């Protein structure tokens, strides 16, 4: 969708909602850009689980999600994080609406092929009609990373993956994956650009590690599936690391 920008907010969403962030959103809207936000909430989910004495377990960067964890995840994402984000926009008189998989089956999903993860899923389809209708009315959409499968099970979805699937389905002009670092680092230097076919090599070299591994895998998917520009950064106002499809020039 021409002129559409997707932004994935970090796990501590409030860290991203700075005045500079909102000024960039306002500038984009003035330039007739359509904005979609996908938010995480890992920090808040972990905090709530600990307060309820529910064990926190992760595997390969993904939260192991049993029934209790799933209920907490839904409660926090839909009932705490998303309203905080939409309220921040409303305070600035920016039209916004929060969406989740319960809204017309927005994000269809299926279980990941790992029974040890529990109710963790992957997006199989993004129903773009509702998103596009709202964007046509200049309403920013804020989407929670939860999916529903054919049996109507709710599934926890990695927020980076969800953002990349949404951006790809919309054929977005740009995707910004906001995180807590200003880009992908090699030593102390930010790498300006990474081609998708360089990612595995950088991973083996130890340049890419930890939570950056699944983030780059998601970014590569978006770059290879029609998203015009994919950037990993800590702010909409910094250049970060651009993920480019195929082989980098030079």
From Swiss-Prot:
GO terms for cellular component: cytoplasm. It is found in: Cytoplasm. The record marks 8, 215 as: Transition state stabilizer. It catalyses: N-acetyl-L-glutamate + ATP = N-acetyl-L-glutamyl 5-phosphate + ADP. InterPro entries: AceGlu_kinase-like_sf, AcgluKinase_fam, ArgB, Asp/Glu/Uridylate_kinase. Substrate binds at residues 41-42, 63, 156. Its EC number is 2.7.2.8. It is an enzyme of class 2 (transferase). Keywords: Amino-acid biosynthesis, Arginine biosynthesis, ATP-binding, Cytoplasm, Kinase, Nucleotide-binding, Transferase. Coiled coil: none annotated. Catalyzes the ATP-dependent phosphorylation of N-acetyl-L-glutamate. Belongs to the acetylglutamate kinase family. ArgB subfamily. This is Acetylglutamate kinase. The gene is argB.
